[in-house]
């Protein structure tokens, strides 16, 4: 057995019950895609007895057009979790050190720990100080950050510390494109950027992600990649979403407007603005609010293990967020 697994703490899923009567605002999924796009995807699902195209050329061509990055610097995966997994596996050896600003997306900890590596959590304000003292092999950042929603420019650090690799998880970049370094990553010897179709694109169910990096690291990733991991549905849906990004952008714009409305409604509360599709609310009665919302069929995420008395709320419809704001105001 891999002895490193003795140190792995399993990722704890939220208490989610699948039901059409529930409103899910706990996992930061994006808004549903338009019906016309769903129909086009269904119409193209005609060949499921063969493996999907392992080259994924049509999908990569669409990503090249969307991102402006040559497809030779892009690879696709079964979700960005898989992309992150491959990135860590390529870069890390046992006993290497990884620095992660805290709080952050915790799913990556399983991969890092299973490889026998050490993790240092630090505040984002002391990141450079910890790079100097801890000398990590890898720094992982989610930009915008999950769950705080702040953005961070990684490139100055990548230039200043060429001996450290920087993995930047841009899962929420569609909600604040100015923060993205996706079109710059391939120019650096020590930068990998991952993205997903789960958030801004509203396609969490298909599990589709992608990454970009320089040709040297990309060749290492491709040397161990399972090129059949992107299924036919995911490849088709990804292409259709990219072809009609105008509709996706409309959903994103609406989400950002709803978020502003929600924050304005709760301006007297300790609520963190965010460059993603969620906000973090701090309240001494957070657990009571979470339970009342749950009793009404609305799920939000308790984040008190990161910051005491906090909940993370994914943006839903305007009506959803108005209802939630009115409930919070009772406390």
Annotate each predicted stretch with a short phrase.
Residues 155, 295-296, 305-331:
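PLP-dependent enzyme catalytic core of the Aspartate aminotransferase-like
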Residues 34, 55, 115, 190-265, ...:
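PLP-dependent aminotransferase class I/II
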Residues 124-176:
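Active-site phosphate-binding strand-loop segment of PLP-dependent enzymes
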Residues 56-57, 71-95, 209:
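Conserved beta-loop-alpha segment that forms the PLP phosphate-binding cup at the N-terminus of a helix
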């Amino acid at each position: 057995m891999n002895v490193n697994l003795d140190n792995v703490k399993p990722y704890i899923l939220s208490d989610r019950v699948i039901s059409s009567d529930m409103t899910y605002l706990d996992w930061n999924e994006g808004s549903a895609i338009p019906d016309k796009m769903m129909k086009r995807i269904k119409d193209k699902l005609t060949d499921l007895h063969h493996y999907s195209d392992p080259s994924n050329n049509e999908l990569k061509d669409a990503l090249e057009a969307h991102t402006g990055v040559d497809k030779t610097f892009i690879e696709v995966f079964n979700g960005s979790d898989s992309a992150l997994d491959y990135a860590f596996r390529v870069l890390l050896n046992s006993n290497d050190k990884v620095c992660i600003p805290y709080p952050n997306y915790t799913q990556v900890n399983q991969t890092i720990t299973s490889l026998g590596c050490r993790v240092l959590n630090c505040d984002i304000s002391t990141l450079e100080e910890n790079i100097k003292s801890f000398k990590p092999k890898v720094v992982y950042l989610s930009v915008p950050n999950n769950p705080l929603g702040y953005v961070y420019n990684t490139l100055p650090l990548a230039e200043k510390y060429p001996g450290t690799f920087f993995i930047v998880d841009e899962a929420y970049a569609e909600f604040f494109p100015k923060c993205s370094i996706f079109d710059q990553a391939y120019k650096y010897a020590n930068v990998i950027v991952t993205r997903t179709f789960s958030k801004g694109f509203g396609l969490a169910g298909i599990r589709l992600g992608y990454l970009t990096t320089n040709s040297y690291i990309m060749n290492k990733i491709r040397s161990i990649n399972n090129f059949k991991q992107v299924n036919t549905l995911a490849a088709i849906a990804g292409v259709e979403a990219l072809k009609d990004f105008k509709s996706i952008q409309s959903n994103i714009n609406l989400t950002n407007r709803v978020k502003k409305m929600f924050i304005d409604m709760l301006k007297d509360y300790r609520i963190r603005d965010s460059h993603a599709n969620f906000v973090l609310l701090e309240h001494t009665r957070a657990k009571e609010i979470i339970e009342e919302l749950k009793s009404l069929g609305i799920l939000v995420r308790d984040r008190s293990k990161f910051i005491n008395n906090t909940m993370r709320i994914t943006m839903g419809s305007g009506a959803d967020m108005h209802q939630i704001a009115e409930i919070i105001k009772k406390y």
